[in-house]
C-alpha cells in the first residue's frame, strides 16, 4: 500500500470537490491530509489567485455551481471569495488535520456557504469536533503559521 499525501487549501472549491472523493484513494494507501496556505504559495511565486482576477472568479463560480449538481455534491458559494483562511487552517491543525476536522471546515464553507472567519461558526465547528476551548484551538495553529510561508514544507 502506498502513502498518499494530499495537499489542499480550503479556499478552493476544486479542493472541496476532490475531498468528496478522497475516501476512494484509501483503498490504495494511507492518505495524509496536508493543508497549505495558498496565499503563501501565491506570494512565493508572485502571482494573483484565481479569485483575485474577476473573470477567473466568475468562471470558477459558474463552473463550480454547474459541476456540483452534475456530480451529486451539495454546494453553496460562501458570501465572499476569496476569504480569510487562518481560522479553518488553525482549527484543522489543532485537530491534528484529521479527516473529521477537514470535512467540518470544507462542509461549513462550501456546503453550508459559511464565512470561515465568523467567530460563532468557528465556535460551532470546534464544538462539533469536541474542542472545548476555541481560543486554544486558534493559538494551537501558531505552529502552522510559522511554517506556512515555506513552500514545499
Each model region followed by its residue ranges:
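Structural alpha/beta surface segment adjacent to cysteine/selenocysteine redox centers
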Residues: 10, 14-112
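Generic hydrophobic-segment detector
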Residues: 2-5, 62
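C-terminal cap of thioredoxin/glutaredoxin-like
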Residues: 3-4, 11, 15-32, 97-100, ...
Amino acid at each position: 500500500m502506498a502513502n498518499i499525501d494530499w495537499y489542499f487549501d480550503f479556499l478552493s472549491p476544486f479542493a472541496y470537490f476532490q475531498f468528496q472523493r478522497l475516501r476512494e484513494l484509501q483503498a490504495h494507501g494511507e492518505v495524509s491530509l496536508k493543508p497549505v496556505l495558498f496565499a503563501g504559495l501565491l506570494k512565493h511565486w508572485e502571482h494573483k489567485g484565481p479569485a483575485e482576477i474577476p473573470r477567473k472568479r466568475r468562471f470558477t463560480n459558474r463552473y463550480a455551481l454547474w459541476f456540483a449538481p452534475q456530480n451529486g455534491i451539495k454546494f453553496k458559494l460562501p458570501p465572499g471569495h476569496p476569504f480569510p483562511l487562518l481560522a479553518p487552517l488553525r482549527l484543522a491543525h489543532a485537530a491534528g488535520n484529521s479527516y473529521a476536522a477537514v470535512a467540518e471546515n470544507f462542509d461549513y464553507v462550501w456546503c453550508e456557504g459559511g464565512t470561515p472567519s465568523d467567530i460563532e461558526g468557528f465556535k460551532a465547528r470546534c464544538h462539533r469536533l469536541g474542542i472545548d476551548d476555541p481560543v486554544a484551538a486558534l493559538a494551537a495553529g501558531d505552529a502552522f503559521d510559522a511554517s506556512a510561508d515555506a513552500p514545499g514544507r
